[in-house]
UniProtKB/Swiss-Prot annotation:
One of its GO terms (molecular function) is ATP binding. It is found in: Cytoplasm. Catalyzes the attachment of alanine to tRNA(Ala) in a two-step reaction: alanine is first activated by ATP to form Ala-AMP and then transferred to the acceptor end of tRNA(Ala). Also edits incorrectly charged Ser-tRNA(Ala) and Gly-tRNA(Ala) via its editing domain. Its cofactor is Zn(2+). Zn(2+) binds at H566, H570, C668, H672. Consists of three domains; the N-terminal catalytic domain, the editing domain and the C-terminal C-Ala domain. The editing domain removes incorrectly charged amino acids, while the C-Ala domain, along with tRNA(Ala), serves as a bridge to cooperatively bring together the editing and aminoacylation centers thus stimulating deacylation of misacylated tRNAs. Belongs to the class-II aminoacyl-tRNA synthetase family. It comes from Parafrankia sp. (strain EAN1pec). This is Alanine--tRNA ligase. The keyword Iron-sulfur does not apply. GO terms for biological process: alanyl-tRNA aminoacylation. Pfam families: DHHA1, tRNA-synt_2c, tRNA_SAD.
C-alpha cells in the first residue's frame, strides 16, 4: 500500500465519522515557544489550552513535522527521521476514550488489514477505563499498564495533561524477545498514540509534577506516524526505504557512486543525505531561509550535513539541484507548493550548497591545523577557541565541527565555544530585548479573550475611534492589572482598535489614546496571541482603568508614510519577478515610514541595468495613478485570479487581496494607499546579499525619496562646479583623478621605500659582533610606517647573508619594532618571536611573531635604549 493510499484511508476514515479534514499547517510554528511544528497537535494547541474556541468539534489532519532533538540518530536507526508526517484525529470536548480507542482499532484492522493477533496496547498505570475498553478488542495478556514516563502526556509545563494509550505492532521473534512493549520496543513497534487530555498539571519536574484539577472539557489528541505505518505496510526495514523516501536514497547513491546496502557506514551517510534533503525542501517551501539563528539555522544545518556527507561518500559535483528534483517528484503530489515554487526552492538550496562548498574548502585548512595542534600537544580535544574561529570566520556550525572532530577521533570543548558565542551575543541581545514587548506570560490574555472576545480591527476604514479598555497587563511579566498611572508603561487591550499591529513586514501604527483626565502615547502594537491586539503605551497623564472609555487615535501622517512603503513593496516585488523570473519571490520585507526593505530569492547580484529598469518601471506605474483596492474572497478564487501568495506564508479559507490596477495582485493584510500616484517617487538605494540565495533591496518612497534626490542634485552640482565637468562627464572625470592619484601614491611609496633603504648598507656595514652574531640595532624617524620598518629590517638582514644575524629596527616614538633573524642565528636558538617577547614585550610593549621575523608596538621612546641593551644580553647569552 503506497503512502498516498495510507493517507487517503486515514482522512476518509475520520471524515466518515464526522471529523473536518484540516490541511497541514506550515512548519513555521505560530507558537512562540517553538521554532518548528514538531507534533500533529501543535496547530490545535490554542484550542486545547482554551485560548481560542475550536471552529469544529472534531478534526483530522496529516501534519508536516520537523524534529531535530534526535538528529544524531537519523540514519542510524530504523525509526528516526527529522521530517515526518503525523496523522491525527482530534476531539474538542466532544467524544472521549470510548470512541477514540475503537476508531483507531477499526482503521488499523479494517482499513489497513492488520491481524488483531499482532497488536498490543499499553495504558496508563491507573487508567482502568482505557483498559476496560481495550479488553473488548484485545485479550488481557496483550494489554500492559505502564507508568507516567511511558503513558502519561503533558507539554512539560503547567497546563493540559492526561493519560495516553499506545498501540503496538509485533514484528515477530526475528526482531527481539517476547514480552510485549515493556520487554522490547524494537520488536514491538509503536504505531499510534492516543492522548486523553482531561487533567491540569502544576509545577514540577518532567515526571514529578502534581495533578491540580480537571479540565473544563475533555479532549482527544492522537498521532499515527505516516512513514512508520508505511514501513510496516510496505514490508521494508526502515522508513528510508518507503515509496516517498527510497527515490531520494537511490538518487543520493547514484550521485555519490555508492551502492546502498554495500557498507553499513556508507548506508548511514546515504540515509542522512536523503533525510536532510527532504527536510530542507519542506522547510524552504514553508518560507524558511538559511541563517545562523533559529529555524534558519536548523535549515542551514540540514543542508550542510547533507552536502558534507555527500562529499564524504564521493560526490565531486554539487548534488542539491538533482536531489531536490527527486524530492519534488516524490512529495509534490501531496504538497503542491514544492512544484509551484520549484525554481525558488531549488535556488535557495543550490546557493547554500555553493557557499558551503567554498566554506569547506577554506575552513578545512584551519580545521586540519587545529587538529594537528591538538594532537601535537597531546590533547584529545579541539579547543573552544578553534571551534569559535571556525564558526566566526568560516561559518562552520558547531555541530559540523563536532562531526568532523569525531571523524578525526577528537572531541570539542563545546562549553568554551558557547562562552565565546555568548560573549559575542550579549550586546545585541540586550538591545533587542529593550526594543520589544518581551516574553510575556501569555496566560494573562486567556481570561481577557474569553470574557471580551477578539479585538475588532477597524483601521482599514478609520484612523480614530471610541473604544473601551478590556484589559491591562504589565510589560515584561504579563501580570494582569486593573489600572496604570502617569509614567507607567503597560500593555492595554481594547474591544476595537484602528491601530495596525506589526505583521507581514509592516511596522505597527503609533499614536495616542485619550481618556477622561489624561492620555497615553502608543509606543508599539503587537498580537501576543491570535485575535488579541495589545497596545504598548506610556501613560502621559491621568489614570488608565479597565472598563474605561477611550478615544484611540492613529498618527495619520506616519500611517500614510508606512502605507506608501507597503504599496511600493508590492510594485517592487512584481517588477523584480517580471525582470528576473518567477523565482524572484519575496523572502521578507520591512515597511517603515518613507522607507522599505525588500528581500527576495536570487542566485547572484542583480545587474545595475536591471535595478535601473525596475526603478523606472515602478515609478512609471506610480505616475499612471492606478487605483489600489482590496477585497476579501476565497483562497481558491484568489488563486484563480492570479493573486500572488507570499513564499512560505499560509492563509485561511478567506483571504484579503490587494490590487494595484492591473499591474500587481497580492494576498495581503496590510494597509495601502488609495492610488499609485500617492506614492510620489520610489528610489532604490542599494542591493546586497544577506545570505546564500537571498538578496536585499532598500528604497525610499514619497517625500523621503524627493529629499534624497534633491540632496543628490545639490551634490552633483557642487561636484560639477569643483571639477569643471558636466554631470554626464563626472564619472569619467572622477575615474581619471582616482587613477592619477593611485599612480602618485605608488610613486610616493617607491620614493619612501628608497629613502628608508638608503641607509641599509651603512647599517649592515656597522653591525656589532656579539659572540659571533652580527647584531644591528637601529632607529628610524618617528612616524615611519610599520611596513617600512619591516622593509628596512629585512633588507639589512639580506645584506648580512652568510653571517649569523639579528636585526632590530625601531620607530623612534616606539610605535613599531621589527626583529629579523637569519637561518644560522635561528639554529643557535635566536628566534625573532622569542627576542621580541623577551625584550620589547617584557619591558611594557606588545608583540610577538614567527621565528624568522616578529613585530611589536604600543611602546614609547624611553624603552628603546633598554630594549637594545636587552637584545645584546639575549644574543650574548645564547651565543655563549
Amino acid at each position: 500500500m503506497d503512502t498516498a493510499e495510507i493517507r487517503r484511508r486515514f482522512l476518509n476514515h475520520f471524515s466518515e465519522r464526522g471529523h473536518t479534514v484540516v490541511p497541514s499547517a506550515s512548519l513555521v510554528a505560530q507558537d512562540p515557544t517553538l521554532l518548528l511544528v514538531n507534533a500533529g497537535m501543535v496547530p490545535f494547541k490554542p484550542y486545547f489550552l482554551g485560548d481560542l474556541k475550536a471552529p469544529w468539534n472534531r478534526a483530522t489532519s496529516v501534519q508536516k513535522c520537523v524534529r531535530t532533538v534526535d538528529i544524531d540518530n537519523v540514519g542510524r536507526t530504523a525509526r528516526h527521521a527529522s521530517f515526518f508526517q503525523m496523522c491525527g484525529n482530534f476531539s474538542f470536548g466532544d467524544y472521549f476514550k470510548a470512541e477514540a480507542i475503537p476508531f483507531a482499532f477499526e482503521l488499523i484492522v479494517d482499513g489497513y488489514g492488520f491481524n488483531p493477533d499482532d497488536l498490543w496496547a499499553t495504558v496508563y498505570l491507573d487508567d482502568d477505563e482505557a483498559e476496560a475498553i481495550w479488553r473488548t478488542l484485545l485479550p488481557a495478556e496483550r494489554i500492559q499498564r505502564r507508568g507516567k514516563k511511558d503513558n502519561f502526556w503533558s507539554m512539560g509545563v503547567p497546563g493540559p495533561c492526561g493519560p495516553c494509550s499506545e498501540i503496538y505492532f509485533d514484528r515477530g521473534p526475528a526482531y527481539g524477545r517476547e514480552g510485549g512493549p515493556e520487554a522490547d520496543e524494537d520488536r514491538y513497534l509503536e504505531i499510534w498514540n492516543l492522548v486523553f487530555m482531561q487533567f491540569a498539571r502544576g509545577e514540577g519536574s518532567e515526571y514529578g509534577y502534581e495533578i491540580v484539577g480537571d479540565l473544563p472539557a475533555r479532549n482527544i489528541d492522537t498521532g499515527m506516524g505516516l512513514e512508520r505505518m508505511a514501513t510496516i505496510l510496505q514490508g521494508v526495514e526502515n522508513l528510508y526505504e518507503i515509496d516517498i523516501s527510497r527515490p531520494v536514497l537511490d538518487a543520493a547513491g547514484r550521485l555519490t557512486g555508492t551502492r546502498y546496502g554495500a557498507d553499513p557506514d556508507s548506508d548511514v551517510r546515504l540515509r542522512v543525505v536523503a533525510d536532510h534533503t527532504r527536510t530542507a525542501a519542506m522547510l524552504i517551501s514553508d518560507g524558511v531561509s538559511p541563517s545562523n539563528e533559529g529555524r534558519g539555522y536548523v535549515l542551514r544545518r540540514m543542508l550542510r550535513r547533507a552536502v558534507r556527507d555527500a562529499r564524504l561518500l564521493g560526490a565531486r559535483e554539487p548534488v542539491m539541484d538533482e536531489l531536490f528534483g527527486v524530492v519534488r517528484a516524490a512529495m509534490g503530489p501531496i504538497y503542491p507548493e514544492l512544484v509551484d515554487q520549484a525554481e525558488a526552492i531549488t535556488a535557495v538550496a543550490v546557493a547554500e550548497e555553493t557557499a558551503f562548498l567554498e566554506t569547506l574548502r577554506t575552513g578545512t585548512t584551519l580545521f586540519d591545523t587545529a587538529v594537528t595542534q591538538a594532537r601535537s600537544s597531546g590533547s584529545s580535544q579541539l579547543s573552544g577557541e578553534s571551534a569559535f574561529r571556525l564558526h566566526d570566520t568560516y561559518g562552520f556550525p558547531i555541530d559540523l565541527t563536532m562531526d568532523m572532530a569525531a571523524d578525526a577521533g577528537l572531541t570539542v570543548d563545546e562549553a568554551g565555544f558557547r562562552r565565546l558565542m555568548e560573549r559575542q551575543r550579549q550586546a545585541a541581545k540586550a538591545d533587542r530585548a529593550s526594543r520589544r514587548i518581551g516574553n510575556l506570560d501569555l496566560s494573562a490574555f486567556r481570561p481577557i479573550l474569553a470574557a471580551s472576545g477578539p479585538t475588532t480591527f477597524t483601521g482599514y476604514t478609520e484612523l480614530g475611534r471610541e473604544s473601551g479598555i478590556v484589559g491591562i497587563v504589565g510589560i515584561g511579566d504579563g501580570d494582569s492589572l486593573t489600572a496604570a498611572g502617569e509614567g507607567e508603561e503597560v500593555g492595554i487591550l481594547l474591544d476595537a482598535t484602528p491601530f495596525y499591529a506589526e505583521s507581514g513586514g509592516q511596522e505597527a501604527d503609533l499614536g495616542r489614546i485619550r481618556f477622561d483626565g489624561g492620555e497615553a502615547e502608543v509606543l508599539d502594537v503587537q498580537r501576543p496571541v491570535p485575535d488579541l491586539v495589545m497596545h504598548r503605551v506610556k501613560v502621559l497623564g491621568g489614570e488608565l482603568r479597565v472598563g474605561a472609555d477611550v478615544f484611540a487615535e492613529v498618527d495619520v501622517e506616519r500611517r500614510r508614510a508606512v502605507s506608501r512603503s507597503h504599496t511600493a513593496t508590492h510594485l517592487v516585488h512584481t517588477a523584480f519577478r517580471r525582470a528576473l523570473g518567477e523565482s524572484a519571490t519575496q523572502a521578507g520585507s520591512l515597511n517603515s515610514p518613507g522607507r522599505l526593505r525588500f528581500d527576495f530569492h536570487a542566485l547572484g547580484a542583480v545587474p545595475d541595468s536591471v535595478l535601473a529598469d525596475v526603478e523606472d518601471e515602478v515609478n512609471e506605474i506610480a505616475l499612471r495613478d492606478l487605483e489600489v483596492r482590496w477585497y476579501v474572497t476565497s483562497q481558491e478564487e484568489a488563486r484563480r485570479l492570479g493573486a500572488m501568495a507570499l513564499f512560505g506564508e499560509k492563509y485561511g479559507d478567506r483571504v484579503r487581496v490587494v490590487d494595484v490596477g492591473d499591474y500587481a495582485r497580492e494576498l495581503c493584510g496590510g494597509t495601502h494607499v488609495a492610488s499609485s500616484a500617492q506614492l510620489g517617487a520610489i528610489k532604490l538605494l542599494s542591493e546586497s546579499s544577506i545570505s546564500a540565495g537571498t538578496r536585499r533591496v532598500e528604497a525610499l518612497v514619497g517625500m523621503d525619496a524627493f529629499r534624497f534626490l534633491a540632496r543628490e542634485h545639490v551634490l552633483v552640482s557642487q561636484l560639477s562646479s569643483t571639477l569643471k565637468a558636466r554631470p554626464d562627464e563626472l564619472a569619467d572625470r572622477v575615474a581619471d583623478i582616482v587613477g592619477r592619484l593611485r599612480d602618485a601614491e605608488k610613486e610616493l611609496e617607491r620614493l619612501r621605500a628608497q629613502a628608508v633603504l638608503a641607509g641599509s648598507a651603512a647599517l649592515a656595514a656597522g653591525a656589532e659582533d656579539v659572540g659571533g652574531v652580527a647584531l644591528v640595532t637601529a632607529q628610524v624617524p618617528a612616524g615611519t610606517p610599520a611596513d617600512d620598518v619591516r622593509l628596512l629590517a629585512l633588507d639589512v638582514r639580506g645584506r648580512l647573508a652568510g653571517r649569523p644575524a639579528v636585526v632590530a629596527v625601531v620607530e623612534a616614538a616606539g610605535a613599531a619594532v621589527v626583529v629579523a633573524t637569519d637561518e644560522t642565528a635561528r639554529t643557535r636558538g635566536l628566534r625573532a618571536g622569542d627576542l621580541v617577547r623577551h625584550s620589547w614585550a617584557a619591558l611594557g610593549g606588545k608583540g610577538g611573531g614567527k621565528p624568522d621575523v616578529a613585530q611589536g608596538g604600543r611602546g614609547d621612546a624611553d624603552m628603546i635604549p633598554k630594549v637594545f641593551a636587552r637584545l645584546r644580553e639575549l644574543v650574548a647569552d645564547q651565543s655563549a
